Amino acid sequence: MEYAFASTRLKLRSASLPLNRLRALSESATASEIMDVLHRFGLKDTSSSLQDADMVLRGAFKREAEGVLRMVKTSKFLALFLRKFEILEISDFLTNFNESKLAVKVMRTSELLSLEHSADLKSIIAQINRRFGFNLNQNMAIGEIEDQILSQYLLKLSLISPTSIKPIIEKERKLIALPHSTDFEHFLGEHKGSWFYKVLNVDKNLIDLKMAVYLQHISKIYAVRDPIGPGAIVSYMYYLDLNYKFMKSLYFSVKTRIRLNLRAIWEI
């Protein structure tokens, strides 16, 4: 099935979470804010005016575009993973784009990796297994493959311990929130004083354990120190390729309440 997907739109979608946060804070972003966001994410301004840039930004949040974002979230994560390790070029996901109409046609999830110009799904899985020593089943659904890649990759990086934090990734990809459990309290106690501990303690019911582990990972890699604000949290997350689901869990699942809490933390 032919589908359209533009490089620029891919970048806009990658940036859509912080853009969404910006729009939540201000329903009518100024032209300068729009240009700043476009340049911040490395988007070359191909338009001739700020008005055109405004149209590009706002077009990314049309109802139909948001529907497309939900449809492609599975391929988005897998595409980032494959690109990161040069298993599959991201360009294989991009074809025939009609910018004026925001024409984006997306295959059903089961067909997302049936690419015309690349290896088939079984070949891709075989490459991943050889490269990382994984044991991915070629007959699994794409969503299951995605979960297995993420959980096995995190375990390889020693980011999670299945004996002390249970379980980070569920098969159905449900959020894990353990506000009253021994494991969760122990986890908080081990990391008291860190900036993500402050995030968790604002409202523990709003944050899942995956997010805590991910924040811990970022703080280690970039030696992040207190205080740090929501803008910086977003920026650091976007330097990591394997970020899509974690960002989704933070900025979509808990939405406005957590954004406001993050803003309050910035002022601590």
What function would you assign to each model-found segment?
Residues 1-268:
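N-terminal domain-start signal
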